[in-house]
């Protein structure tokens, strides 16, 4: 049941350097910028975010595999910034974003070479339906957790 008539729109990542992080997702995952770049500030933003003096810049990136009207990854850089906690996969709230890739080990190496960090080891699990998923957690250059996964029968 969808009593709100809702549909998925976007996931937001708050970045330290939004341009660099957007370039990472464009280059390594095929995300595509959706113009225009965002630049918001003023009383409405402060009221909406509850952050006094809030200002943000950033962009929306179309996620791969969903066509020209699919959901986006919204990457914003806020002023003033608030430093975060170290990345972990089991903290309540945003856990990770997952991308299906052809080759998990190669994708892992590419992410690490681009400034990401390892979180866990590559593993293959068999699901209840008998499918196999090979996956690993890494971080992007700013510490956001990414799951790289590949499926087989």
Question: Which sequence ranges carry the predicted segments?
Answer:
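Vicinal oxygen chelate
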Residues: 1-4, 13, 35-36, 73, ...
């Amino acid at each position: 049941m969808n009593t709100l008539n809702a549909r998925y729109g976007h996931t937001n990542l708050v970045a330290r350097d939004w341009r660099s992080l957007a370039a990472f997702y464009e280059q390594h995952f095929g995300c595509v910028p959706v113009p225009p770049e965002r630049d918001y500030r003023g009383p409405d933003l402060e009221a909406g975010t509850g952050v006094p003096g809030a200002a943000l810049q950033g962009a929306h990136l179309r996620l791969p595999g969903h066509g020209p009207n699919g959901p986006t990854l919204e990457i914003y850089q806020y002023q003033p910034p608030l430093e975060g906690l170290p990345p972990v996969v089991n903290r309540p709230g945003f856990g990770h974003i997952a991308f299906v890739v052809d080759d998990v080990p190669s994708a892992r190496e590419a992410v690490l070479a681009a400034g990401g960090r390892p979180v866990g080891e590559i593993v293959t699990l068999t699901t209840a339906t008998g499918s196999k998923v090979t996956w690993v957690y890494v971080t992007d250059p700013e510490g956001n957790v990414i799951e790289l996964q590949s499926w087989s029968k």
